[in-house]
Amino acid sequence: MNVPDRKKALEAAIAYIEKQFGSGSIMSLGKHSATHEISTIKTGALSLDLALGIGGVPKGRIVEIFGPESSGKTTLATHIVANAQKMGGVAAYIDAEHALDPGYASLIGANINDLMISQPDCGEDALSIAELLARSGAVDVIVIDSVAALVPKSELEGDIGDVHVGLQARMMSQALRKLTATLARSQTCAIFINQIREKIGVSFGNPETTTGGRALKFYSSIRIDIRRIGAIKGNESFDLGNRIKVKVAKNKLAPPFRTAEFDILFNEGISSAGCILDLAVEHNIVEKKGSWFNYQDRKLGQGREAVREELKKNKKLFDELEKRILDVTSVPKATVVEEKKEEQSIQPVV
C-alpha cells in the first residue's frame, strides 16, 4: 500500500471510529491541549512544589501521600484543599477515619463552610462517593483519608477475628480502574492518604509497605513519602512543631526521587515563610553569616525563627524572595488553568 492509500485508509478508519464512539474519541496527540500544560494545585510548601517538578500536585491524576503516624499526611492534604479553595475551586474530604478536626483545618486556611465532607460506613461507599463527585465535573480535589480505614462491607458485616484475604486490595483495584478515567476527564485531583505497615520475615531490604495492595501504587501519578525527622524547639521547654522530610517516591510528570524539607508548626501548619527562607539561603539569595541573615544590603535579623517571623509580617519581602527563587529554579508557578469541564450525568455506581 502506497502513502496516499495509507492516508485514505487511516482517514476512513478515524471517521468510522468517531461515528461509532463519538467526536474526539481519537485525535492527534499534538492537538490535545491537555498534554501541553498541566494544571496544578500548590502544596503549601514551596520546597515540595519544586521537588514535584511541576509546581504542585496535578489535577486529573491520583496522588498518594503515605508515611508513619503523626508525620503530617493530613496536614499536607488539608493545605492542598485550602489552596484549591483559594484558586476558586471546590474541595471534598472523605473522612473514613472520622478524625478530621474542623478547627485545625480552619487554622490551616481551609474554608470549612464550603468544604464538603463525607464519613461513609464502608470502603465501597467511600469510593463510590469519590467517583460520583469526580464524574460531576464540579470538584477540583477529593481527599480520601485514609486507605487503611476503607473497610470492605463484607468485613464490616462479619465478626472480629474472621479472616478476609485480599478483600481490600480487590476493592481498591476495582474502584481505581473506574476512577482513573473519570478523574482525567473531569480534571479532578484525588489524594489518597495511606499508612505504613511492615512485612513479616523480611531480613534484607525495606520491610515497609503501604495498605490496600498494589493497585494504588500503579495508578498513582505521584507518590509522596513524608517523614518527621526532628522537633522544632521553642524558647521554653515545649516544641513549636516538627521538621519534615518528603521524598517523591514516584513521579510520572517529572524526575522522581527528589527530596524536600519544611516545617510544620502546631499553630499554623506548614510554614511557608520557613520554606522561603531555607530556599533563599540554599540558592544564595539570602546570605547567612553565623546566626545573622542578610538580604542585599539589609539585615533581616538574628536567628532563623526571628527571620521567619519577619517574613510572615513583611508580605512584600516574602513575595520578592519567592519570585527570585522561582526565577532561579525555573519551575512554573501553580496557576489556575481554565478547564472546560464537560457536564456528565451522574448515575448510581454499582
Swiss-Prot record:
Transmembrane segments: none annotated. One of its GO terms (biological process) is DNA repair. Pfam families: RecA (PF00154), RecA_C (PF21096). GO terms for molecular function: ATP binding; ATP hydrolysis activity; ATP-dependent DNA damage sensor activity; damaged DNA binding; single-stranded DNA binding. SMART domains: AAA. It comes from the Bacteria. CDD domains: RecA (cd00983). Its main location: cytoplasm. It is found in: Cytoplasm. Keywords: ATP-binding, Cytoplasm, DNA damage, DNA recombination, DNA repair, DNA-binding, Nucleotide-binding, SOS response. GO terms for cellular component: cytosol. ATP binds at residues 67-74. Belongs to the RecA family. Can catalyze the hydrolysis of ATP in the presence of single-stranded DNA, the ATP-dependent uptake of single-stranded DNA by duplex DNA, and the ATP-dependent hybridization of homologous single-stranded DNAs. It interacts with LexA causing its activation and leading to its autocatalytic cleavage. NCBIfam families: tigrfam_recA (TIGR02012). This is Protein RecA.
